[in-house]
A protein has these predicted regions:
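Carbohydrate transferase catalytic cores enriched for Leloir-type hexosyltransferases
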Residues: 1-328
Length: 328
């Protein structure tokens, strides 16, 4: 079969969906029984290296990272590619796919239902755009992949798709890596990691509940003067609330914001953490907690949404809406 996978929806800085795309299809492309055709932004070196064994169709990133051109690519260019290369299956990794009827079977991955459950986490445009496409996918996709039972339950609650075409395929992460001493020391020096530290990894946005984590950490600092909080992740929606809270609590000298880091830097920082704290109030899966457990780091996470499903008995669960629960 000829299978088309659209990687143009994946940002250069790989978090969440980006990690899913890279790691899942790195394994899938070992399949020699089918032919894979991959649509990739021409500046995404990470994906190009991952997909080098498959047929790659480039698109100009300077144009197609703008929504209008992105929409054109998805709605018109992809159908043309399906026709030209006699595609049998087209897989969309991020909710949306062509509205034009295709001969190819359509597979779509649903990562979470934040557009319905936490609409304020998105711009008004994105909120309604993806609500439409999730509903459209549930009606017209031939197969719907949910990344957790929690996401499937949310989908059933808000949309009620046809059960026969939905299935749960959980995410996975890389095996732990061993890093040389020079790389470890260079990373620690780069980010000023000189004391033991608690670690959070994720985009700075309200859904990640970092403000409550900071309030709980301020209480920890009063009892342990030799511990820092390291926050790894890029700035997201309403990130200023997080920065403001650090100043209000007077803990700026104990909180380290790394910004976005490379994959190697992320895992070096993770492997050296005293504990990993993930107080998110909603996740479709929650890949960082799985990565933390894989590296055998003591992990504390929320007792809601998909997170109990992901960690099982391998982490401590807490109430993310209760400061004392996070602190304890």
């Amino acid at each position: 079969m000829n299978i088309l996978i659209d990687f143009t929806q994946i940002p250069i800085q790989k978090v969440g969906v980006g990690v899913y795309a890279r790691e899942t299809f790195f394994e899938l492309l070992r399949d020699t029984n089918n032919k894979y055709c991959c649509l990739v932004q021409d500046d995404d070196k990470d994906m190009l290296n991952t997909l080098k064994s498959s047929k790659i169709i480039f698109v100009k990133s300077k144009w197609f990272r703008f929504f209008f051109f992105r929409f054109f690519l998805e709605q018109f260019y992809i159908p043309w590619i399906c026709y030209k290369y006699k595609i049998n299956i087209v897989h969309s990794l991020h909710y949306s796919f062509p509205l034009i009827p295709l001969r190819a079977k359509k597979v779509v991955t649903i990562h979470d239902l934040t557009f319905f459950i936490y609409p304020k986490a998105h711009t008004i445009f994105k909120r309604y755009y993806f609500r439409f496409f999730i509903r459209f996918a549930c009606r017209f996709a031939d197969e719907i992949i949910c990344v957790s039972n929690s996401t499937l339950n949310d989908l059933n609650l808000h949309i009620k798709p046809i059960k026969s075409k939905t299935q749960v395929i959980p995410l996975a992460c890389e095996q732990p890596k061993v890093f040389d001493l020079e790389s470890i020391n260079n990373t620690k020096a780069k980010f000023g990691l000189h004391r033991k530290y608690l670690l959070f990894i994720g985009t700075l946005e309200p859904r990640k509940n970092i403000v409550n984590l900071l309030i709980a950490f301020e209480k920890i600092v009063k009892n342990d003067s030799c511990i820092d909080l390291v926050i790894v992740g890029k700035k997201g929606w309403f990130y200023n609330d997080t920065l403001t809270k650090v100043q209000e609590l007077n803990i700026a000298n104990r909180v380290i914001f790394t910004g976005f880091v490379t994959t190697e830097e992320k895992f070096i920082i993770l492997s050296g953490a005293y504990a990993f704290i993930y107080p998110s109030i909603y996740e479709g899966f929650g890949l960082p907690v799985l990565e933390s457990i894989t590296y055998k780091i003591p992990t504390v996470t929320s007792n809601i949404s998909s997170l109990p499903e992901v960690v099982g008995q391998a982490a401590i669960l807490m109430n993310p809406n209760n400061i004392d629960s996070i602190y304890n």
